[in-house]
């Protein structure tokens, strides 16, 4: 048996300001820090063997705050891709084997919003028209100017899920993934076999853990974790 936890980052400063964020590296708001700490307390008894995150600071910071509250897991250590960083990142000593590795990847980044990034959503409607902005936000295949559609996001997140995250889970490792609304939406669409209409209705709340469990029968959704237990409703 193994647990797989998905966590959208806590509220960012631009979430609070209703601004298209995408790949802009915006930090958490004070409310987002609080959300991440609450998530950490809810997950305090989960012993995570491996962590995955996007490369954006709001997701990484959420992971760090969660793991600070976690009582069962080891300290985290980012595993780097480059040869030099791997060498410089080596930790020597008896405690080095006890770190929980963190793998960060751009494939888990938020949907790239192109020319919408940095625009207040109401201002974007004034510039491009509310119908086009609605279409870009709520269609599966239509992308904003110079940006990604949700389908484009799916086509980079799901291969990463298959190549790295799911194999780790099948080895019996407990995994946490901190990412973003649209990158997680596309991953969950794959796991839940949602069609293009269903995935557009899927809303991923900030800072609320979504827990899956893998056993001999396969991967099963337990639901969103809260103080009372699990809420299994997805859409």
UniProtKB/Swiss-Prot annotation:
Active site per the UniProt annotation: 9 (tele-phosphohistidine intermediate), 110 (proton donor/acceptor)
Matching Pfam families: His_Phos_1 (PF00300)
Gene3D superfamilies: Phosphoglycerate mutase-like (3.40.50.1240)
Gene Ontology molecular-function annotations: phosphoglycerate mutase activity
Keywords assigned by UniProt, alphabetized: Gluconeogenesis, Glycolysis, Isomerase
Positions of substrate binding: 8-15, 21-22, 58, 110-113, 121, 137-138, 181-182
Catalytic activity field: (2R)-2-phosphoglycerate = (2R)-3-phosphoglycerate
Domain of life the protein comes from: Archaea
Pathway this chain belongs to: Carbohydrate degradation; glycolysis; pyruvate from D-glyceraldehyde 3-phosphate: step 3/5
EC supergroup of this enzyme: isomerase
Claim: Isomerase is one of the keywords in the record: yes
Enzyme Commission (EC) number: 5.4.2.11
Annotated site residues (Transition state stabilizer) in this chain: 180
Gene Ontology annotations of biological process type: gluconeogenesis; glycolytic process
Entry similarity comment: Belongs to the phosphoglycerate mutase family. BPG-dependent PGAM subfamily.
Stated role: Catalyzes the interconversion of 2-phosphoglycerate and 3-phosphoglycerate.
Protein name in UniProt: 2,3-bisphosphoglycerate-dependent phosphoglycerate mutase
Protein species of origin: Methanococcus vannielii (strain ATCC 35089 / DSM 1224 / JCM 13029 / OCM 148 / SB)
């Amino acid at each position: 048996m193994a647990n797989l936890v998905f966590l959208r980052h806590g509220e960012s400063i631009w979430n609070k300001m209703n601004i298209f964020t995408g790949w802009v590296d915006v930090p958490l708001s004070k409310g987002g820090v609080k959300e991440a700490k609450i998530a950490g307390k809810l997950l305090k008894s989960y012993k995570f063997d491996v962590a995955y995150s996007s490369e954006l600071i709001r997701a990484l910071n959420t992971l760090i705050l969660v793991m600070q509250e976690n009582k069962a897991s080891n300290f985290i250590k980012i595993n780097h891709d480059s040869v030099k960083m791997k060498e410089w990142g080596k930790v020597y000593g008896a405690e080095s084997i006890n770190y929980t590795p963190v793998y960060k990847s751009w494939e888990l980044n938020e949907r790239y919003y192109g020319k919408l990034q940095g625009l207040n959503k109401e201002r974007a409607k004034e510039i491009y028209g509310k119908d086009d902005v609605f279409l870009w936000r709520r269609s599966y295949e239509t992308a904003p100017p110079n940006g990604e559609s949700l389908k484009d996001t799916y086509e980079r997140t799901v291969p990463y899920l298959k190549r790295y995250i799911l194999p780790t889970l099948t080895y019996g490792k407990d995994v946490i993934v901190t990412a973003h609304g649209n990158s997680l939406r596309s991953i969950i669409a794959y796991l839940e076999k949602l069609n293009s209409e269903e995935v557009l209705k899927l809303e991923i709340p900030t800072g609320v853990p979504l827990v899956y469990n893998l056993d001999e029968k396969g991967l099963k959704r337990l639901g969103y974790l809260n103080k009372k237990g699990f809420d299994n409703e997805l859409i």
